[in-house]
């Protein structure tokens, strides 16, 4: 495994054709502080620009996957908090692969609890797998926060009612990995949990076996289809194929 640029809050590396972006604040349940928010944009760009990387896996260190903003830490840095608030209000978030326009396939390998803003990384990944120890919840409403971005993202990929139930029930609605699989939030549950990274690497390598430009085109066409009607989606796919020559 090749370790890439040094980061304070992330571990970024490459194993064969697979790039790894690991949230690395395990003592804080991998919550996003000001440093991580800045580093995520750089790390996604680094992996997307690396010609040796064909697929990216995103996971967490320790027992948590990702638990959203570290509001305690950000409260100590008013300028950083104001900047994040400004970006949120303008829908200019820059921490997931989708936010940063990453063209390569991204697999979210959810190793533990995924809460609040952490759901962005599930909603915006191209493929999501989870260990049997993973769980999912959106506690925003329970703490008086009005944040629907994560659940809007999830509603593009799975049935509407369970997403609405998560949003309204807050901390009282925690989905197990198996329940998330049943609802279509994840496509695979890995048991035992300690095999998650091995399974993620194997899946990523199977995807990386294909031509990078074709992977990027297929990814783009399918994401664009979520914002179009059926006929428009077909026409868009044909146009993309013609553009590719």
Predicted regions: what they are:
Residues 1-61:
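Conserved CoA-thioester-binding segment of acyl-CoA-metabolizing enzymes
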Residues 21, 58, 70, 121-123, ...:
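Hydrophobic/aromatic residues within transmembrane alpha-helices
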Residues 1-20, 24, 167, 172-209, ...:
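Amphipathic alpha-helical segments at domain termini/boundaries
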Residues 45-48, 71-111, 151, 157:
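An acidic, glycine-rich surface segment that forms the CoA-thioester-binding/catalytic face
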Residues 63-67, 115, 137, 222-225:
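Short, active-site-adjacent cap segments at secondary-structure transitions
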Residues 221, 232, 236-245:
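Intrinsically disordered, low-complexity segments enriched in small/flexible residues
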Residues 94-103, 109, 115-168, 199, ...:
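CoA-thioester-processing core
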């Amino acid at each position: 495994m090749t370790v890439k640029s040094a980061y304070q809050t992330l571990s970024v590396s490459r194993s064969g054709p697979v790039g790894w972006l690991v949230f690395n604040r395990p003592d804080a349940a991998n919550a996003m502080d000001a440093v991580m928010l800045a580093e995520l944009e750089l790390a996604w760009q680094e992996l997307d620009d690396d010609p040796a990387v064909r697929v990216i896996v995103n996971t967490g260190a320790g027992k948590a996957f990702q638990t959203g903003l570290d509001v305690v830490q950000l409260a100590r840095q008013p300028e950083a908090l104001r900047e994040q608030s400004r970006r949120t209000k303008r829908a200019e978030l820059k921490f997931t692969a989708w936010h940063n326009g990453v063209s390569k396939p991204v697999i979210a390998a959810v190793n533990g609890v995924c809460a609040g803003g952490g759901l962005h990384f599930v909603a915006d990944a191209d493929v999501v797998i989870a260990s049997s120890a993973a769980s999912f919840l959106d506690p925003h409403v329970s703490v008086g926060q009005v944040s629907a971005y994560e659940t809007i993202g999830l509603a593009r990929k799975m049935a509407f009612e369970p997403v609405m139930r998560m949003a309204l029930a807050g901390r009282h609605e925690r989905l197990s990995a198996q329940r998330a699989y049943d609802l279509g939030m994840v496509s695979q549950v890995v048991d035992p949990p300690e095999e998650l990274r091995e399974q993620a690497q194997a899946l990523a390598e199977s995807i990386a076996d294909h031509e990078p430009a074709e992977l990027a085109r297929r990814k783009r066409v399918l994401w664009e289809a979520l914002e179009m009607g059926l006929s428009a989606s077909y026409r868009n796919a044909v146009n993309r194929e013609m553009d590719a020559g």
